[in-house]
């Protein structure tokens, strides 16, 4: 039912689209989705996401969409102006950016995307055909920048295609979430450049039942105890763990698709991939046959230091839209700070979007899940300053370290990264405002 599907998605969060489909982006088939896709966002959704069944989409109809949210969206972000810079002026993106900036996320709306929904101002509309939310792109303090922002859902709404695939298929999508390891993997055939780091710490984790394994304190202990670990097949971090001896190949199971039923059926005997900002709440509060705590360790804490949900684009756009990015990136930096400090307004937009989508994408999400995610993002410093106290800035040495670790992993997977790949090929700090930090 919808509930299982909803949890399904939570489990996956960024992970399914990132890890399973990033490989899809590396195959030559990905860009062929292009032809019709660029005509409109709706066609993209239809062409890439047969699974969601466009037949159900129109039933809820856009008639209900505009009402959702226009009333509930408070002046996003006016409660805190944050610190440092980020003071935008009215209309400042008009004429230098596309009239509608489309940003592709990697899942259906959830609090992990809050820093984007934070920029959607009053009078937004929810489109339940293509799972998007459109409103005036509003900077910190309620400043209307003069362009529209459309936040596009991913995951089940886009047939689980990776954002890299979707950006190459539809050039009207200016920006999308790309994890650093995915950028490394696709650097030879489908390169992307990230212009803002997103999550300084990837929310992905491995979780286990503390009642079954009271002595397990981390992922390496799961390896020692030979516990079965379910994950999304193709995830590079897992190949890193098995090739470096953290886990062994015979204990990992790549069949996981986000459904909680196997974890529940195993009664705590197996471990599983998830998001630290999502599953612990779901399993303790919502999954009826579980309803007890789980314990977890973040993947970043075991050496695979990935940035998550970085804001990235196709390389040609770096020059083409440099004037736009120079103004837009500081707005994203400040929006991230505003959301982290005061998530209520953007969470209201997220919940309105989920309600507006109805059952079209098999996603359920509630206030408790949104509140838990926002609190965890702050508490566990998933959003945090980068080098020099600057939010959104990439640590080039850290990216270089991940490239070094990832090259043998992806080469073994038959999707070798670009020869001689450097951090500057996949990330840039050129548009970052150094005065903006938490």
Task: Name the predicted role of every residue range.
Residues 321-413:
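Secondary-structure end/capping motifs
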Residues 84-256, 263, 270-273:
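Short, glycine-/small- and polar/acidic-enriched structural segments
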Residues 8-12:
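C-terminal motif of bacterial Sec signal peptides marking the signal peptidase cleavage site
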Residues 19-84:
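Extracellular mucin-like PTS domains
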Residues 181, 257-360:
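Pocket-lining segment of extracytoplasmic ligand-binding domains
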Residues 13-17:
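Bacterial signal peptide processing site
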Residues 78, 87, 396-438:
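Conserved C-terminal helix/tail region of periplasmic/extracytoplasmic solute-binding proteins
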Residues 125-144, 296-304, 319, 381-394:
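Short, solvent-exposed loop/beta-turn-alpha elements that line the ligand-binding surface or hinge
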